[in-house]
Amino acid sequence: MEKRSFLSLIAMLVCSITIQAQSKKWTLEECVTYAIQNNISIKQSELDSKMALIDKKSAVGRFLPSLNASASHSWNIGLNQDITTGLLQNKTTQFTSAGANVGIDIYRGLQNQNTLRKANLSIVAAKYQLVKMKEDIALNVANAFLQVLFNKENLKVQKEQLRINEKQYARSEELVKAGSIPRGDLLDVKATLALNNQNVITAENSLLISKLSLSHLLQLKDFENFDVVDDTDVKDENNIMAQTPSAIYEKAFEGRTELKIARTNLEIAEKNVAIAKGAFQPTLQGFYSFNSRVAYSDRVTGVIPNASNPTSIVGFVEGTNQNVLSPNFTRVLGNPAPFFDQFNTNKGQSFGMQLSVPVFNGFSARNNVERSKVSLERSKIAVEQQNLDLQRNVYTAFADAKGALNAYESSVAALEARQGAYNYATEKYSVGLMNSFDFNQSQTLLTNAQSEVLRTKYDYIFKIKILEFYFGIPLIKN
């Protein structure tokens, strides 16, 4: 019994969690935050920032000395000189050698310094690129979010219209039975009802597709249970429309990320020119090397008189012709000297500086300078183009927002008029003073007016978001 109660409790808990998960409605802030944290493009941009940091480490490493160590062991097989006789004999000798080399750039035409400055600028550019990517994702999410809201409200309108038409169809049946309207009018209402059903299905499909688009930006897989809050207020909370286009442009000129990217890329191009020019200057390098070797052959440890041939004639005394004799000795061989004794005895060192002056390199350095100058001119043009694009975009966005506001206000006024006309038509139709064609026409005009209010409302909201974006107001509050 206790086991059954425990299982029931677990089942209720799982069911409760599932219901909560399905009933969760996402806010715009949650959508934007989640997209920034999980979007694949942003993750790739973060990797670019890491690569820029690695490039800086490489640039710093150019100021440090290079150290290389080497060691070798060799076997010499074949004719080798015998140290006791001086003759060549077939034998095997072994040698071990080791060494180390240190090199450092003392002067390289300021290329190392400019490379480090370029690496620092590349880090800044990568950070700006990441910020730009997040801003673009936030705008795309906001647009997709508002599209979901529009489709949700549009579905409500279509369902409400279907409900009204169902009631109207029932009322028309009563009027036909009473003889107030002809049966043909009932068929017209039935056809309109079928069209309303089709509109509901179309609205449901549009809502599903918009949810799919938004969930794709958020990298969510369960888009069917995905939903957003019904936040539909049309408000200019930051009073952005009170600003002038020139004021918005000045604010955007100071803080827009795409301008910062273009300016940073211009500085990088300037450093590339300096690096390329450095190839014309001489380079000065310092070096130090150490080496030693160890042999494993027998060595001469002493001499003893040669008993079989104690002396050798080395000359004659002038006048007497007496022989001049020299004692003969035999070399005594011993084991090789200890490893570290040989290593210490045979060590050698060298150090110095090397100056290299470029004279002619097949126009390679000159062409690199010319290429870097062309890239610099492109960067200057890109900055100028970004300024022009920003100015055009700001003024266009302001005009679009103003036009969207006027369109929204006009659509609201039109809806009020259409609602009054529809109410009047309903009264006339209910007493048989209007035919079904005219009544359906009034109903269609009302539905179109409701849809137009929704369209202009969300268009205005998004246009306001874009203006705030240029003015430096974030889409979400931290």
Where are these regions (language model features)?
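Terminal intrinsically disordered/low-complexity segments used for targeting and assembly
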Residues: 1-34, 204-250, 300-304, 310-336, ...
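Sec/SRP-type N-terminal targeting helices
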Residues: 43-47, 60, 92, 106-134, ...
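Bacterial Sec-pathway N-terminal export signals of envelope proteins
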Residues: 21-68, 72, 78, 222, ...
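Short segments within alpha-helical structural elements
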Residues: 47, 195-220, 409-473
